[in-house]
Amino acid sequence: MSKLFWAMLAFISRLPVPSRWSQGLDFEQYSRGIVMFPFIGLILGGISGLIFILLQPWCGIPLAALFCILALALLTGGFHLDGLADTCDGIFSARRRERMLEIMRDSRLGTHGGLALIFVLLAKILVVSELALRGTPMLAALAAACAAGRGSAVLLMYRHRYAREEGLGNVFIGKVSGRQTCITLGLAVIVATVLLLGMQGLATMVVTLAAIFILGQLLKRTLGGQTGDTLGAAIELGELIFLLALL
């Protein structure tokens, strides 16, 4: 199980993980690591929250919010943000399903993808700033948001089909069991509830899960399934929705 954790941490972050710590795991086994997603989010969000706490006394709330969101993007190598941009480029192209999927595979950034990145990153910075001004404990809020975003992404994996024939998302989409889904969601709810001291965390998590479930159904109807890009989009939007629900 520890090998699986390190493999997942290396897969969805840019944190330096020695390859020997996950040695012997096949890529096809990665679907079992979905239950680790909330804990990985907890680590990444915790680092982002620490950066906010350290910088706030020195440069103020707005710049601390900017740098903690920048750190979060760097910690993931922009992996999920790239998925968000590709998803928006495809969905908002208003083309046929097959053409949408082709556009999503194009490495070039389109207008819709660029606008989505600007909106989501700016919204995160503004929401983090507002939460801090309201006295919200930012270490807990950011850690919980990242755990919620990654945990809720399982809703786009369970009983969904992969919209393409190949790709990174194929290791998760349609391969996750009901038991793994329940454990992943349960862990995300527990993390949010513990960090945010009870009902606020639980209510915020319910809002996030409902929004991501609806997003998954809309993407399924539009694309005929999910891709690695839509998983990245769900994680980014899940984080933002969680933070917004805390306001």
From Swiss-Prot:
It is an enzyme of class 2 (transferase). It is found in: Cell inner membrane. It catalyses: alpha-ribazole + adenosylcob(III)inamide-GDP = adenosylcob(III)alamin + GMP + H(+); alpha-ribazole 5'-phosphate + adenosylcob(III)inamide-GDP = adenosylcob(III)alamin 5'-phosphate + GMP + H(+). GO terms for cellular component: plasma membrane. It is a multi-pass membrane protein. GO terms for molecular function: adenosylcobinamide-GDP ribazoletransferase activity; cobalamin 5'-phosphate synthase activity. Its cofactor is Mg(2+). InterPro entries: CobS. PANTHER family: ADENOSYLCOBINAMIDE-GDP RIBAZOLETRANSFERASE. This is Adenosylcobinamide-GDP ribazoletransferase. It comes from Salmonella typhi.
